[in-house]
UniProtKB/Swiss-Prot annotation:
Protein name: Retinol-binding protein 1
Residues annotated to bind all-trans-retinol: K41, M63, Q109
Pfam families: Lipocalin
The gene coding this protein: RBP1
Localization of this protein: Cytoplasm; Lipid droplet
Length: 135
């Protein structure tokens, strides 16, 4: 059975985030603001149905999906694009592929101990985030 990501997670590290946003063509003002934020993640998982809430003082983003089923993801407020997204299990990791204007876009998420690791990719740029479980 896949790992359970359910919980509330506080950000510990956010490596190469501004470069990731630059690769998404996010304007410089938004990149500077976003780079100062330390968003939390609230994840609810019921089987293969997941809701991932990314919460910050500036903007919130909610991703609600069924693992293994492609859906249209509206990234308004991030880079204002839409893409066709599929999230799949790869062992105990979640692998996301986001098909759209940008090449090689997606992310991988996994748990090590009480830490949630998120590696986001676009056009060869990689951002690594680490969160600590608080409940």
């Amino acid at each position: 059975m896949p790992v359970d990501f359910t919980g509330y997670w506080k950000m510990l590290a956010n490596e190469n985030f501004e470069e990731y946003l630059r690769a998404l063509d996010v304007n410089v003002a938004l990149r500077k603001i976003a780079n100062l934020l330390k968003p939390d993640k609230e994840i609810v998982q019921e089987g293969d149905h997941m809701i991932i809430r990314t919460l910050s003082t500036f903007r919130n983003y909610i991703m609600d999906f069924q693992v293994g089923k492609e859906f249209e993801e509206d990234l308004t407020g991030i880079d204002d694009r839409k893409c066709m997204t599929t999230v799949s299990w790869d062992g105990d990791k979640l692998e996301c592929v986001q098909k759209g204007e940008k090449e090689g876009r997606g992310w991988t998420q996994w748990i090590e101990g009480d830490e949630l690791h998120l590696e986001m990719r676009v056009e060869g740029v990689v951002c690594k985030q680490v969160f600590k479980k608080v409940n």
